[in-house]
Amino acid sequence: MDDARTLLDIKEYPDTEVQKNRVLTLEEWQDKWVSHKIGFHQEQGHKLLKKHLDAFLKGESGLRVFFPLCGKAVEMKWFADRGHSVVGVEISELGIREFFSEQNLSYSEEPITEVPGAKVFKSSAGNISLYCCSIFDLPRVNIGKFDRIWDRGALVAVNPSDRKRYAAVMLSLLRKGFQYLLAVLSYDPTKHAGPPFYVPDAEIKMLFDTKCKIHCLEKVDAFEERHKSWGIDYIFEKLYLLTEK
């Protein structure tokens, strides 16, 4: 990557047809967990969330925090340890079990009656509940509303053709006075088909502008050695804060 390249040099690409038609099945995502192809998992947690955590929480206690497509995100324990109630949804049962195991948390599991074949895993302390089902099955389960949403590796993982449906689910979960922190990736989508998918600014506005004020908090260089195999020479992560209009 050219070190002289600045953030302002990076062109915002319109979303491309090759990504719009790209589809990953739930089975393919589950296979990634089985074969441990989970380069998206961050063992130390997300640096930008860590940096903006206090501003995100605003000193409030007892918040309900939602993690869409949560995987085994270590940040779930961060929030639980601060006295908040965490709910996540993840298609991979393996990912959910690994979360509880790696965080040394005992848990119980029970079927979700509204969604055949789905389960919910609950920490023994009762402050973390992870639903093993499709995000699009969630409206059938009454999980209530949330004060905070941490969306990292979720919107960028949803098939582009499903984004409107996804945004509708997210907006339906927001409680009055919410804060929705959203991390997306910016790269040349003509060189990498995704996932993770490229989500341009215009798409975020189209999906959320009707109900949310949208503020870009930060844009950072996220390029790593592994990204070379994607055929790209730059990738930036952008952090947005969505609040009530």
Curated annotation (Swiss-Prot):
- The answer to keyword Ribonucleoprotein applying to this record is no
- Which amino acid positions bind substrate, per UniProt? 40
UniProt feature coiled coil, ranges: none
The terms under GO molecular function for this entry are: thiopurine S-methyltransferase activity
Q: Which residues carry this modification: N6-acetyllysine?
A: 58
Q: What is its EC number?
A: 2.1.1.67
- GO cellular component: a single term: cytoplasm
Q: Where in the cell is it found?
A: Cytoplasm
GO BP terms: methylation
Record's catalysed reaction(s): S-adenosyl-L-methionine + a thiopurine = S-adenosyl-L-homocysteine + a thiopurine S-methylether
Q: Which Pfam families match?
A: TPMT (PF05724)
Sorted alphabetically, the keyword list is: Acetylation, Cytoplasm, Methyltransferase, S-adenosyl-L-methionine, Transferase
What the entry lists under InterPro entries is as follows:
SAM-dependent_MTases_sf, Thiopurine_S-MeTrfase, TPMT
Judging by the UniProt lineage, the source's domain of life is: Eukaryota
Task: Indicate whether Nucleus appears among the record's keywords.
Answer: no
Binding residues for S-adenosyl-L-methionine: 29-40, 69, 90, 134-135, 152
Q: Which family does it belong to?
A: Belongs to the class I-like SAM-binding methyltransferase superfamily. TPMT family.
According to the record's subunit comment, the protein's assembly and interactions are: Monomer.
Q: What is this protein called?
A: Thiopurine S-methyltransferase
Protein's organism = Oryctolagus cuniculus (Rabbit)
